[in-house]
Design a protein with these regions (language model features):
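N-terminal membrane-targeting hydrophobic helices
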Residues: 1-167
Length: 167
């Protein structure tokens, strides 16, 4: 499905107009520009909704019909469950477990260097380390320690300016 189809589900379920919902659904699916298979679905997790979508769009908003819309509920019922055929919503642990063929030699050192070179704020550091906190898996930091997260997601969250450096 695409963001317009998801937004139309939201309109049918919650009222309002397509424009009320399209930005949320477009962000959830924005990772398709990174890869077009199921690996793009990092924002299709509870972590993605809680740590990325809600900080950008807030917990609630009022749609054009005057209805109060809970962002978490919208994401889960109108997008994530739909994409997973109403079977489940994956956790970030599920996503990380599916990350295969990650070269681990020197990974800790590379991630630590990236973190110290790019991050200078304790709250921002906590956001970037949150996948590790949840999963206990070092490779989970590849989700947040990359140019897409630093230069697209963090500025949308209002947590950082884009960084003009080699990644």
């Amino acid at each position: 499905m695409n963001p317009v189809q998801h937004a139309n589900i939201s309109v049918k379920r919650r009222g309002g107009e397509l424009e009320d919902y399209i930005d949320i659904h477009a962000l959830i699916d924005s990772t398709k520009m990174l890869c077009t298979d199921n690996r793009h679905r990092i924002l299709h997790t509870f972590w993605g909704v809680q740590e990325v979508i809600i900080p950008i769009f807030g917990h609630h908003f009022e749609n054009s019909a005057g209805n109060s819309i809970e962002v978490k509920d919208l994401c889960e019922k109108d997008h994530l469950l739909v994409d997973f055929h109403h079977r489940f919503i994956p956790t970030i642990g599920d996503f990380v477990a599916a990350m295969q063929d990650i070269p681990t030699y020197g990974l800790a050192k590379r991630l630590e260097k990236f973190h110290s070179d790019v991050i200078d704020d304790p709250k921002l550091s906590a956001t970037l380390l949150s996948p590790l906190s949840v999963t206990g898996q070092l490779k989970s930091l590849l989700i947040t320690h990359n140019s897409w997260f630093i230069n697209t997601i963090l500025p949308m969250m209002g947590k950082s300016e884009a960084k003009f450096i080699d990644f």
